[in-house]
Curated annotation (Swiss-Prot):
Any one of the GO CC terms: protein-containing complex
Induction: By heat shock.
Biased composition regions of type Basic and acidic residues, renumbered to the chain: 564-585, 806-815
Sites bearing N-acetylserine, chain numbering: S2
Disordered: annotated span: 500-585, 801-858
Quaternary data: Interacts with HSPA8/HSC70. Interacts with HSPA1A (via NBD) and HSPA1B (via NBD).
Task of the protein: Acts as a nucleotide-exchange factor (NEF) for chaperone proteins HSPA1A and HSPA1B, promoting the release of ADP from HSPA1A/B thereby triggering client/substrate protein release. Prevents the aggregation of denatured proteins in cells under severe stress, on which the ATP levels decrease markedly. Inhibits HSPA8/HSC70 ATPase and chaperone activities.
Protein name: Heat shock protein 105 kDa
Gene field: Hsph1
Bridged cysteine pairs (disulfide): none
GO MF annotation list: adenyl-nucleotide exchange factor activity; alpha-tubulin binding; ATP binding; ATP-dependent protein folding chaperone
């Protein structure tokens, strides 16, 4: 079973996997751990990752990047309309109102949703992980920004489902970083001690996130989070781009914004310049050749100028930090450490601002680029049964307060209740109780729309169906279980109605059966309490909310004893006495039955099942097309490689191994094949290249074999000659009565001599025949035949010549005057045997126990 953590960023992605030795960040086919979040579409296939980024400038209109923030948003979203102006590709509205991306693929115009584009990127990451692990990848944990709303999170889950990934958890970036930090720490305070508070700061390509976490041994709790979704390294790049656009317009009369390719080149160079200024404070040049209209441009900037240019952005850094400290009510002295991650935190001015705010130096003990992916892989290992990981519980926080609104049964007014406050523990479940006579609706929304970086405050509408009044006309008691799950998504998981069913007592046996019902059928309230205890154990608390109209309570309600449980012991004794008496009349008896109710969810920007299936089918077809195109290109490259290899060697090492007539014919075929490759064969089917390769190999293979045989034959013949000399010398020593071989039987040695003579005769004949042939003729014997003779010779001779000499027993000593005969050898052997038995007498056997793979986390 695979354990994979995926950090899917706006600019780049990282993949971490769990192995027996710990967590490892893996590299792609370019030996790079960083895979760009770029997808390029061509006339035959898709290109994803490094190869796509390399052609981003030349295929700007069909290369998609920076699409992560489009998840779960409508096309008319203000953020989408603003970002649309800065993109090299076109955005279009989809049929469901979402964001679509228009590209030319397979020479046709296609419209892909954001979920499909992300699924393509996940396909590449999945393929990279499978190539590294050498096994299929299904289970994974994917990172998302902590400020992602329900709609955005569901959109990411749909993308994972399209590519066939089972996302065990959508993990917040900062929570993943905290897990990667805390699980390796050996000096954390005990559970009963004051926790260690650490602040994590992450500035990536497009966003800025901070969180405060409390650590104890074996657990972490997120105290609070804050963020600026529109502040990242990209904004610093844009400041440089704006500066140099204005400079080039004045200096060279060139408008870089008028041509998308020129603007993309300037973006790339400004990003490089920003990274250089992080380590150099001197003036640094920026040079671009043939920028526009065949003109070269140049400029320069130093760190102080850059910081002055970005002063407005640097001031924004403190806003989320102030927000975090206010939410958590922490002081600077309460914070033990400040850990920074993310590529943009390498900017010296960013580090200085963070350090100045807290009044202490920042720490860089974590890998700034890979910390999120490693944390996701650790979480996946914790959730996977295939790995045994140190016990470590993770309690996340709800980033935005969530409320429910509903209509009263008999009034026009609405009831509102905040079920999850800001920074409430998650995952978490609560139960709300309603008194209703019919189906009713609940609408979930974010209580503070101004604090949510998303235009729609509504989460979804939930309809609790099949609710009916009791048979006596009273309102039914409906219990609704609301939950923020492991993905950070709000949902109404279950709803149940407490139904009172009257029964009649007919005889003593029926009464006795009814009296046993409490043991066989627990009441609904006790069942709910059990569920809540199980669900809330993840967060460590067990609150229960009972809501009736506008009345709310944070304490568990006392169950209404309307069934058999309301009987007192005295009443039970009275009933027992009445069993022996004839029944006076049939008495009604109330049973309490739990009825599960269906809940219909209408969520914001949720992909339908049919649309999702269509996307899955489309992705499968594109994967197959990419595979076929790769095989076709590999076949074409094999033909081209074959042409160059034989042409080069026919004028070199292969020249002696082909006759002049065949040489000219082969060279002519190579030239014709090369011309065909760059003309008619530029775009042919895979089979056409296979046929061409077979035609070339038909002429080239015999030449190649002659060369290889000529190279290897002398070495193999020399080995055979050495073995013959070795066995011939042993036979001669035997005939000379050498003591080393006098134990060998005469008949056995004759077999050796016969085999040596036969093989020697065969070798001489072969060498004489081969000497008469020229190099351009096929050899008389192949090297594999000579190796077979060596093996045959060894099989006959080696068992004979390596026979051990028989052991000679030492004579027994005569009786000595002081005692009986003593066989010293036997006595010695006895002592040795006695000593050898001692370990067996005292030793113990402990069989190895097979278990889960242990991960080395120390």
């Amino acid at each position: 079973m695979s354990v994979v953590g995926l950090d899917v960023g706006s600019q780049s992605c990282y993949i971490a996997v769990a192995r027996a030795g710990g967590i490892e960040t893996i590299a792609n086919e370019f030996s790079d751990r960083c895979t760009p979040s770029v997808i390029s579409f061509g006339s035959k296939n898709r290109t994803i990752g490094v190869a796509a980024k390399n052609q981003q400038i030349t295929h700007a209109n069909n290369t998609v990047s920076s699409f992560k923030r489009f998840h779960g948003r409508a096309f008319n979203d203000p953020f989408i309309q603003k970002e649309k102006e800065n993109l090299s590709y076109d955005l279009v509205p989809m049929k469901n109102g979402g964001v679509g991306i228009k590209v030319m693929y397979m020479d046709e115009e296609h419209f892909f949703s954001v979920e499909q584009i992300t699924a393509m990127l996940l396909t590449k990451l999945k393929e990279t992980a499978e190539n590294n692990l050498k096994k299929p990848v299904t289970d994974c944990v994917i990172s998302v920004p902590s400020f992602f709303t329900d709609a955005e999170r569901r959109s990411v889950l749909d993308a994972a489902q399209i590519v066939g990934l089972n996302c065990l958890r959508l993990m917040n970036d900062m929570t993943a970083v905290a897990l990667n930090y805390g699980i390796y720490k050996q000096d954390l305070p005990n559970a009963e001690e004051k926790p260690r508070v650490v602040v994590f700061v992450d500035m990536g390509h497009s966003s800025f996130q901070v969180s405060a976490c409390a650590f104890n041994k074996g657990k972490l709790k997120v105290l609070g989070t804050a963020f600026d979704p529109f502040l990242g390294g990209k904004n610093f790049d844009e400041k440089l781009v704006e500066h140099f656009c204005a400079e080039f317009k004045t200096k060279y009369k060139l408008d870089a914004k008028s041509k998308i390719r020129a603007l993309l080149r300037l973006h790339q160079e400004c990003e490089k310049l920003k990274k250089l200024m992080s380590s150099n404070s001197t003036d640094l040049p920026l040079n671009i050749e043939c920028f526009m209209n065949d003109k070269d441009v140049s400029g320069k900037m130093n760190r102080s100028q850059f910081e002055e240019l970005c002063a407005e952005l640097l001031q924004k850094i403190e806003v989320p930090l102030h927000s975090l400290m206010a939410q958590t009510q922490l002081k600077a002295e309460d914070v033990s450490a400040i850990e920074i991650v993310g590529g943009a935190t390498r900017i010296p001015a960013v580090k200085e601002r963070i350090a100045k705010f807290f009044g202490k130096d920042v720490s860089t003990t974590l890998n700034a680029d890979e910390a999120v992916a490693r944390g996701c892989a650790l979480q996946c290992a914790i959730l996977s049964p295939a790995f045994k990981v140190r016990e470590f519980s993770v309690t996340d926080a709800v980033p935005f307060p969530i409320s429910l609104v509903w209509n009263h049964d008999s009034e026009e007014t609405e009831g509102v209740h905040e079920v999850f406050s800001r920074n409430h523990a998650a995952p978490f479940s609560k139960v709300l109780t309603f008194l209703r006579r019919g189906p009713f609706e609940l609408e979930a929304f974010y209580s503070d729309p101004q604090g949510v970086p998303y235009p729609e405050a509504k989460i979804g509408r939930f309809v609790v169906q099949n609710v009916s009044a009791q048979k006596d006309g009273e309102k039914s008691r409906v219990k609704v279980k609301v939950r923020v799950n492991t993905h950070g998504i709000f949902t109404i998981s279950t709803a149940s109605m407490v139904e009172k069913v009257p029964t009649e007592e007919e005889d003593g046996s029926s009464l006795e059966a009814d009296m046993e019902c409490p043991n066989q059928r627990p009441t609904e309230s006790s069942d709910v309490d059990k569920n809540i205890q199980q669900d809330n154990s993840e967060a460590g608390t067990q609150p229960q909310v009972q809501t009736d109209g506008q009345q709310t309570s944070q304490s568990p309600p006392s169950p209404e004893l309307t069934s058999e449980e309301s009987k007192t012991p005295d009443a039970d004794k009275a009933n027992e006495k009445k069993v022996d008496q004839p029944p006076e009349a049939k008495k009604p008896k109330i049973k309490v039955v739990n009825v599960e109710l269906p809940v219909e969810a209408n969520l914001v920007w949720q992909l339908g099942r049919d649309l999702l299936n269509m996307y899955i089918e489309t992705e499968g077809k594109m994967i197959m097309q990419d595979k076929l195109e790769k095989e076709r290109n590999d076949a074409k490259n094999a033909v081209e490689e074959c042409v160059y290899e034989f042409r080069d060697k026919l004028c070199g090492p292969y020249e002696k191994f082909i006759c002049e007539q065949e040489h000219e014919k082969f060279l002519r075929l190579l030239t014709e094949t090369e011309d065909w490759l760059y003309e008619e064969g530029e775009d042919q089917a895979k089979q056409a290249y296979i046929d061409k390769l077979e035609e070339l190999m038909k002429m080239g293979t015999p030449v190649k074999v002659r060369f290889q045989e000529a190279e290897e034959r002398p070495k193999v013949l020399e080995e055979l000659g050495q073995r013959l000399q070795h066995y011939a010398k042993i036979a001669a020593d035997f005939r000379g009565k050498d003591e080393k071989y006098n134990h060998i039987d005469e008949s056995e040695m004759k077999k050796v001599e016969k085999s040596v003579n036969e093989v020697m005769e065969w070798m001489n004949n072969v060498m004489n025949a081969q000497a008469k042939r020229s190099l351009d003729q096929d050899p008389v014997v192949r090297t594999h035949e000579i190796r077979a003779k060596v093996k045959e010779l060894n099989n006959v001779c080696e068992p004979v010549v390596t026979q051990p000499k028989p052991k000679i027993e030492s004579p027994k000593l005569e009786r000595t005057p002081n005692g009986p005969n003593i066989d010293k050898k036997e006595d010695l052997e006895g002592k040795n045997n006695l000593g050898a038995e001692a370990p067996h007498q005292n030793g113990e056997c402990h069989p190895n126990e097979k278990g889960s793979v242990n991960m080395d986390l120390d």
